[in-house]
Design a protein with these regions (language model features):
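Conserved nucleotidyltransferase catalytic core and NTase-mimicking acidic/glycine-rich helix/loop elements
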Residues: 76-197
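General structural signal for secondary-structure boundaries
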Residues: 14, 42, 69-72, 86, ...
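An N-terminal structural lobe/cap that precedes and organizes the functional/catalytic core
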Residues: 1-69
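Short, mixed-charge, low-aromatic patches
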Residues: 2-6, 74-80
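Short amphipathic alpha-helical patches
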Residues: 29-31, 42, 69-74, 104-105, ...
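Short secondary-structure capping/junction motifs at helix and strand boundaries
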Residues: 53-78, 85-94
């Protein structure tokens, strides 16, 4: 389900938690409702994920919306991102996300228009990584601005963005052939990955 607010956080436990013999649960997830989607990772888990070049954590750190944070801690964590970022893993992550979202959301003759962005964003992120630009920006507007696209395709995306802002998140409409053609081409192209550094 979709929610109005996605809340992501990192947390620490009291010292006793870290001295346990067994490995306790290191994730907090609350049931999703219409307003909130809340989940967080324990600090040590987050550091391990960063070391493993986890793109999801890297996106969390680049979120344009921050409700609360410890500036010094987050600044230090962000400074580690270039050290651990893996173009190969990021490309695979975004390509897989685009495939999954396309199959899950854009197969009917009528589709929920905002779901196009669930596919376009990871596909543009794949292009960003393949171009050697480093970590893809979280903001779709920055990702779009840094992408070289056919003028007609860019106009179609811009029009869809305007329509989404006017009509809201839930609007349905007929599938868009130009966008579908681009998505199909990018997914087919992505099956043969380029050589990227690990």
């Amino acid at each position: 389900p979709d929610s109005d607010y996605d809340v992501r956080f990192l947390y620490v436990h009291p010292l006793e938690w870290y001295l346990r013999v067994e490995s306790p649960r290191d994730v907090i997830e609350l049931p999703i409702d219409d307003e909130l989607d809340v989940s967080g990772w324990e600090w040590r888990k987050a550091l391990g994920l960063l070391k493993g070049a986890n793109p999801t954590l890297i996106e969390w750190l680049d979120s344009p919306v921050v409700y609360q944070q410890d500036e010094e801690t987050i600044t230090a964590l962000k400074a580690m991102v270039p050290t651990w970022f893996s173009p190969l893993r990021a490309r695979w992550h975004y390509y897989s996300m685009a495939q999954k979202n396309f199959r899950g959301y854009l197969q009917g003759d009528e589709v929920r228009l905002k779901k196009y962005f669930y596919v376009l964003r990871p596909l543009l992120a794949v292009r960003w990584v393949e171009a050697g630009k480093g970590v893809p920006p979280m903001r779709f507007s920055e990702l779009l601005a840094g992408s070289e696209l056919d003028a007609a395709l860019r106009a179609e995306i811009d029009e869809l963005l305007e329509r989404k802002q006017r009509a809201g998140e839930a609007e349905y409409g007929p599938r868009r052939p130009l966008l579908h053609a681009f998505i199909h081409a990018e997914l087919a192209r992505g099956e043969i990955p380029p050589v990227l550094p690990d």
